[in-house]
């Protein structure tokens, strides 16, 4: 009996210690530090983050890195190969390709990241509430998402571009309309798993507002896969913009984007003889997408409980 009391006493002391750590925030800080340490030990994730940051910062600081206007034609400098004056050469109307890659990155990254965040906002709001609440609301939204996801996304995008017309705003709206379903299903799946946890049932028993339970207490525990989805969706939308613009169906040609730069290299003569029109931007797109994928994989490995060491 005395031995049992000693064990209980030790257990109570450990429990009190955990409560003290939680109240002081030390336990949360320890978890954050452990997660950060795991991420910093992932070399591919660090490489991806580095590539992502370098290209993003270079695009943002484009006016400081080049003095050329990406839209201004110069018929005296047509199709010049790379040189000290034009690092990536010039295109068919004399525009500086280096300048167009930097400024085009602004628009392409904005399209990719803006579309991914828009999908996440809609998908998370609907998925979290639907997964928590269930009932008729969940069934209706689930069926709507199934309708959108029953079509190949690129085919649906092409159809909507034809109907709505080509513009920067239309393209982002179309990407969000066709892409929110995957985030919704992911968020819904996470919440369906979490909603049976004891702490959720306790919050319900105390009569806490269901929106607070859903978005304040449950969502943070499901945020890891959602962040990963945002990174991977950003890469996907950038590639889709490049593909559509290459075909002449994306952003209007007068706007510099990575896809519109590739649009100038559609003929075999250009591919063989004017490599600087497509190779630099092609490498930039490949590096950026690869960097985002490495970063997303690193975040997934870091936040996945089954991967915790």
Residue spans for each PLM region:
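Conserved G/P- and acidic residue-centered "switch" motifs that form tight phosphate/ATP-binding loops
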Residues: 123, 127, 207, 220-222, ...
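Amphipathic cytosolic juxtamembrane alpha-helices at the membrane-cytosol interface
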Residues: 95-110, 114, 134-142, 195-196, ...
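Short helix-capping/hinge motifs at transmembrane helix termini and TM-loop junctions
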Residues: 62-69, 131-135, 161-166, 178, ...
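Hydrophobic alpha-helical transmembrane segments in multi-pass membrane proteins
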Residues: 50-54, 108-123, 150-158, 224-241, ...
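Short juxtamembrane loops and helix-capping segments at transmembrane helix boundaries
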Residues: 150-158, 243-274
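Gly/Trp-centered helix-boundary motif
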Residues: 1-124, 136, 250, 254, ...
């Amino acid at each position: 009996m005395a031995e049992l009391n000693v064990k209980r006493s030790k257990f109570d002391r450990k429990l009190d210690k955990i409560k003290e750590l939680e109240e002081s925030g030390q336990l949360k800080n320890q978890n954050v530090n452990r997660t950060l340490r795991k991420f910093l030990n992932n070399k591919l994730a660090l490489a991806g983050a580095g590539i992502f940051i370098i290209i993003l910062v270079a695009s943002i600081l484009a006016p400081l890195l080049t003095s050329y206007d990406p839209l201004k034609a110069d018929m005296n400098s047509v199709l010049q190969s790379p040189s000290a004056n034009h690092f990536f050469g010039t295109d068919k109307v004399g525009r500086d390709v280096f300048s167009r890659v930097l400024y085009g990155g602004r628009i392409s990254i904005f399209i990719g990241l803006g579309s991914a965040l828009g999908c996440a906002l809609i998908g998370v709001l609907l998925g979290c509430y639907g997964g928590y609440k269930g009932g008729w609301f969940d069934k209706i939204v689930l069926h709507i998402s199934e309708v959108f996801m029953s079509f190949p996304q690129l085919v649906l995008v092409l159809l909507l571009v034809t109907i709505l017309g080509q513009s920067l705003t239309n393209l982002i709206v179309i990407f969000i309309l066709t892409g929110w379903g995957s985030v919704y299903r992911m968020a819904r799946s996470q919440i369906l798993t979490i909603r049976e946890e004891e702490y959720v049932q306790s919050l319900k028993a105390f009569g806490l507002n269901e929106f607070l339970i859903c978005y304040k207490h449950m969502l943070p525990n499901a945020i890891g896969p959602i962040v990963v989805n945002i990174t991977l969706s950003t890469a996907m939308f950038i590639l889709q913009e490049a593909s559509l613009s290459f075909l002449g169906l994306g952003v209007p040609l007068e706007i510099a984007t990575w896809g519109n730069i590739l649009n100038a290299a559609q003929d075999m003569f250009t591919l063989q003889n004017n490599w600087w029109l497509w190779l630099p931007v092609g490498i930039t797109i490949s590096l950026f997408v690869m960097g985002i994928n490495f970063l997303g994989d690193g975040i997934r490995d870091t936040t996945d409980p089954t991967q915790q060491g």
